[in-house]
Amino acid sequence: SIESLFYDPTIIELKKINIPIHTEVIEVSSKIYKKISFRSSTEGIIAVVKRKNYTKEKIKINNKKVVLILDGIEKPGNIGAILRTSQASNVDTIIITNKKCDIHNPNVIRSSVGSFFKTKIIYLENNEALEFLKKNKFKIYASSLNADKTYLNENYNFPIALVFGSENEGISKFWEENSDIKIKIPMDNDIDSLNVSVSCAIILYEINRQSKFGL
């Protein structure tokens, strides 16, 4: 829900803003607006939004559930891109373990293109996440350079948990040891890794392809 709106009258007129009822509206100078907007090209309006808090108890389990485990991912832009892809590919929940980045970083929110506010995100310790997944019979697939199988050679069984690791180190030893199946994306021309958000999109859409078309 939107709690407050800040706007710069030199960029946008108040009458052009669709303001929700009971929302505090504050006019600010161009100087102040530039300080709080974090970028030069904006629409002239900034909202303070209260985000829902989620816990693992609120994750409803069904036979088409996909959960992402983001294990120590550091770059805000990558997390934001993953949130966007997750919304597009029907991911239910994102669990963050080994936290290295504040999910409220402006670059996370900006690069998610609104998906930040639509995605269930929870923080868990590794052991807590594993216990939850095992209890609810998730099949745990980990994206790993050490995998023997490629993502195309796997028939994905729901409910699914997909683990993606940090940009520099990949998944942690914990998830290397506790995943059910490790998968990788084949690459040519001496390239040994892809951006984590790209890897996430590739594997998620293969799961969607199998689920929707049975191919």
Give residue ranges: language-model regions.
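Active-site/ligand-binding-proximal alpha/beta "capping" segment
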Residues: 141-191
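Short, hinge-like loop/turn segments at secondary-structure boundaries
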Residues: 45, 111-115, 157-160
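Acidic/glycine-rich phosphate/pyrophosphate-binding loops and surrounding catalytic core
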Residues: 38-40, 44-64
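Short, acidic/turn-prone active-site loops that include or flank metal/cofactor-
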Residues: 10-11, 30-33, 99-101, 167-169, ...
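A short acidic, often aromatic-flanked loop/helix-cap motif at beta-alpha or helix-coil junctions
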Residues: 13, 31-36, 127-131, 148-150, ...
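RNA substrate-binding interface of SAM-dependent RNA methyltransferases
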Residues: 4-8, 26, 58-147
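Structured adenosyl-cofactor binding patch, chiefly the S-adenosyl-L-methionine
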Residues: 85-89, 103-116, 173-215
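N-terminal positively charged helical leader segments and presequences
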Residues: 1-37, 139
